[in-house]
């Protein structure tokens, strides 16, 4: 999420240089989307953050992490239009966000991001790669930058310094108390229930499901003794 947040900086910087208030939309508020929101608010504080989240608990977390506008995912395009003052031209907004982070990863979500990112804006794809089908006509006509953000690297910070993503993630996790995103822990040998919980995390009111290897190690030692 931190990596994706900082990938918006070129578009944000260009908006600031033009005297505009930079707008960044985040589509999806699972663990990756929420971490992107935290990264934006911490490291790119100039932005106005608009979030589309499917579930009420995701919406609440998004607000607590610093999002300015939070709406159900289906209403994100309308919220972007209202905040940016853009108009619908065909399937696209005439204005829209300066940058958008897609934290869903489906064909529909990527197309939505392309539609409400302004011309010469930037769409950042966050998460695991997959095969998708897209109509890229608007990308060419509007000269949109489509950027992938995967895991980590050496980040170019807005102040010109270089930082490692892991260092930034550790700082953000502590300062934003991201441990509250952990909804349940499981022993490693209880992986079937853990995976089932993770698969239905959103509708079950959960965000992040994790394994507690300490519990598994303690049990193994006890059985060995």
Segments (PLM) and residue ranges:
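Mid-domain Rossmann-like dinucleotide-binding core that forms the NAD(H)/NADP(H) cofactor-binding site
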Residues: 1-78
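Residue-level detector of alpha-helix initiation sites
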Residues: 30-32, 107-108, 130
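N-terminal Rossmann-fold cofactor-binding loop
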Residues: 52-55, 127, 150
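C-terminal substrate-binding/catalytic core of Rossmann-like NAD(P)-dependent dehydrogenases/reductases
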Residues: 81-86, 90, 94, 133-184, ...
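C-terminal hydrophobic helical "lid"/dimerization subdomain
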Residues: 88, 111, 164-225
């Amino acid at each position: 999420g931190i990596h994706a947040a900082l990938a918006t900086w070129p578009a944000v910087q260009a908006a600031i240089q033009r005297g505009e208030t930079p707008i960044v939309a985040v589509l999806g508020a699972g663990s990756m989307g929420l971490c992107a929101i935290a990264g934006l608010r911490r490291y790119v504080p100039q932005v106005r953050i608009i979030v589309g989240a499917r579930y009420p608990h995701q919406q609440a977390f998004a607000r607590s992490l610093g999002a300015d506008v939070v709406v159900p995912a289906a209403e994100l395009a309308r919220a972007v239009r209202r905040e940016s003052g853009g108009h619908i031209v065909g399937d696209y907004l005439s204005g829209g966000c300066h940058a958008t982070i897609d934290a869903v990863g489906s064909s529909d979500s990527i197309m939505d991001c392309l539609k409400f990112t302004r011309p010469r804006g930037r769409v950042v794809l966050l998460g695991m790669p997959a095969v998708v089908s897209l109509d890229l006509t608007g990308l060419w006509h509007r000269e949109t930058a489509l950027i992938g953000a995967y895991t980590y690297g050496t980040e170019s910070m807005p102040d010109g310094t270089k930082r490692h993503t892991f260092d930034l993630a550790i700082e953000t996790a502590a300062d934003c108390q991201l441990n509250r995103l952990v909804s349940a822990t499981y022993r490693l040998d209880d992986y079937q229930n853990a995976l089932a919980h993770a698969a239905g995390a959103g509708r079950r009111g959960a965000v992040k499901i994790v394994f507690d290897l300490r519990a598994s190690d303690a049990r193994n030692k006890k059985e060995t003794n």
